[in-house]
Amino acid sequence: MKCKLSDICSFRKGKISVDGLNRSTYISTENMLPNKCGITEASSLPTVQLTQEYKKGDVLVSNIRPYFKKIWKATYDGGCSNDVLVFAANSNTDKDFLYYILANDDFFAWCSMPIYCRKP
């Protein structure tokens, strides 16, 4: 059975105040570890007032250099940079299943292809 990614998840669009974050709850591409190894503590917080929100169970994927395979399933709520995509599972989708799909090497290979080579 084939389906579109939009059938199982959507991008989270909410914003969160940076004042409510700390270096443990802020995620950027810099503190996401390559090869699907999770995250480390951020070295600093952004200087803007609001940033992208994520919720526990969301899947965060670095939007920069996808061949590094930076991905993390959130274990708590927080905020992230705009260079991090936040995928929220739809109500009919298991959050672990969404992580499994997005952490698959085929997904990262597809993301690494030039846009004109991608099949819908």
Label each PLM-derived region with a short phrase.
Residues Y26-T40:
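Short, basic/aromatic beta-hairpin or loop at an interaction surface
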Residues P120:
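Extended, charge-rich, solvent-exposed interface segments
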